[in-house]
Amino acid sequence: MTVQTKTKGLAWQEKPLSDNERLKTESNFLRGTILDDLKDPLTGGFKGDNFQLIRFHGMYEQDDRDIRAERAEAKLEPLKFMLLRCRLPGGIIKPSQWIELDKFARENSHYRSIRLTNRQTFQFHGVPKAKLQTMHRLLHKLGLDSIATAADMNRNVLCTSNPIESELHRQAYEYAKKISEHLLPRTRGYLDVWVDGKKVQSSDDFLQEDEPILGKTYLPRKFKTAVVIPPLNDVDCYGNDLDFVAVSDGNGQLAGFNVLAGGGLSMEHGNTKTYPNISLELGFVPPEHALKAAEAVVTTQRDFGNRSDRKNARTRYTIQNMGLDNFRAEVERRMGMPFEPIRPFKFTGRGDRIGWVKGIDGNWHLTLFIESGRLVDEGGKQLLTGVLEIAKIHKGDFRITANQNLIVANVAEADKAKIEELARTYGLIRNDVSKLRENAMSCVSFPTCPLAMAEAERVLPDFIGELDKIMAKHGTSDDYIVTRITGCPNGCGRAMLAEIGLVGKAVGRYNLHIGGDREGVRIPRLYKENITLPEILSELDDLIGKWAAGRDTDEGFGDFAIRTGIVKPVLDAPVDFWDASKAVPIARA
């Protein structure tokens, strides 16, 4: 490592460490005093460091914000409970597992629902503290866990839901699982607290523990990884810290991976030191070196990532601080080999194929559209029960997609009719879903997310309904615009890779971004700030009218907005995301 590289990448060391670094150092490898808090009947939540530590175990403490003021008036603490996010690399789950998870959701969660996420897993919302060990022991019995699905670790690893290319998908999925396992923390703290219920008696009990990859203070910030199979970019690969783009050998077999790093979509309103950015190309590696590449990127981020300012701690800021060439050189040094040149690849879209598709192996796959990923029995719909009934007879597997949908995968020809009958009976197959709605997404936001500034999941259905009317008015109902709503600027709804992105600013108010593309490779530009949903619809009515009248053949809304100068493209986010006047095209020889 050269002095120049080290100095450039580690300037943050001159400042005090964030308190999260103390917390991790003193946590006894993530155990803290969580077991003591579990025994405390006076509060539904966790105290002190434990409030943060449970995140490393895949949970967030939340409360029902709809009734927070009411409970405060009654001199009661907020109705506290936990969100749990399962670790499920590639989103594949067995029907037998689903049946048990459904039972837990109905009997033990406040909202009696299962939420499919755009990180290809499921979440329980509203789990009381008294049921947490029961929940984790159930996951353990089912061969599942929730370790490292939150906090400063490598989160759930995504993999393109591509059952048509069955062999290539199988190989890519195996690497998604291997990467997930390789980058897991080695501490027994998760098992000790949630499964065994064993309290560490002295420091001797954990002196033998080690974290050879993550280190005893783990990563500076969250770290997201995805495996993607072009031409489908369903996992939004440009929004992750680390991406493995599968390259086919031309015969349906895996030739290796293009490695990208430095994507991320969170920011802070008004803080120009924060910005979303797309991931950048490092190079190509053959399959046998994929784990080595993953470890090298993670340890480079571990050692160079900012541990003083958490708002500038993600991998994209590390690359910006070091410079891409220096970052790549450091990764290659740790790999012990250079990257090969990037192999050509291209994305053509990222939406799921709703309905039946046949794989090359002869099996059928039914993709069910699940709006915002929420499976619940309410409002005359029995979506949760519908999936349960399918699980009781399904002989294949389920695949949760990064678009918050559910694939009933590997269905034999003889079983198709019964599966479809159940799906239609319970409203899992609908004939009234527009292309616009199929390509819309939201985060959870109110009432459970403590960071929510504005509604997202609860307003999406009606907002898309109004947008559908505008599309019909301008004769574009057979087309779609990738539209996403997120309740705050932390990026969970991936609005910063949408053609139309709404980012919550305050209750009932949003920033409107436009100019992303259908393939998910361009960040949208801020168009209007701090406006209401009716105002947004009025703006979009005008813009969609212009798009309908002046678009080129097959030109998406975002591309049209850029071509016609409605907004300037975000070309280099660290430079021009906050200042469009600096969006100057890079001259190429």
Swiss-Prot record:
Residues the record lists as binding siroheme: 492
Signal peptide: none
One MF term in the entry's GO annotations: sulfite reductase (ferredoxin) activity
Residues noted as binding [4Fe-4S] cluster in the record, renumbered to the chain: 443, 449, 488, 492
Cofactor(s) demanded: siroheme; [4Fe-4S] cluster
GO biological process: cysteine biosynthetic process; hydrogen sulfide biosynthetic process; sulfate assimilation
Disulfide bonds: none
EC number of the protein: 1.8.1.2
InterPro entries reported in the protein's UniProt record: CysI, NiRdtase/SiRdtase_haem-b_fer, Nit/Sulf_reduc_fer-like_dom_sf, NO2/SO3_Rdtase_4Fe4S_dom, NO2/SO3_Rdtase_4Fe4S_prot, NO2/SO3_Rdtase_4Fe4S_sf, NO2/SO3_Rdtase_FeS/sirohaem_BS
GO cellular component: sulfite reductase complex (NADPH)
Cofactor, how bound (note): Binds 1 siroheme per subunit. Binds 1 [4Fe-4S] cluster per subunit.
This protein's UniProt keywords: 4Fe-4S, Amino-acid biosynthesis, Cysteine biosynthesis, Heme, Iron, Iron-sulfur, Metal-binding, NADP, Oxidoreductase
Family classification: Belongs to the nitrite and sulfite reductase 4Fe-4S domain family.
Name assigned to this protein: Sulfite reductase [NADPH] hemoprotein beta-component
Species the sequence originates in: Neisseria meningitidis serogroup C / serotype 2a (strain ATCC 700532 / DSM 15464 / FAM18)
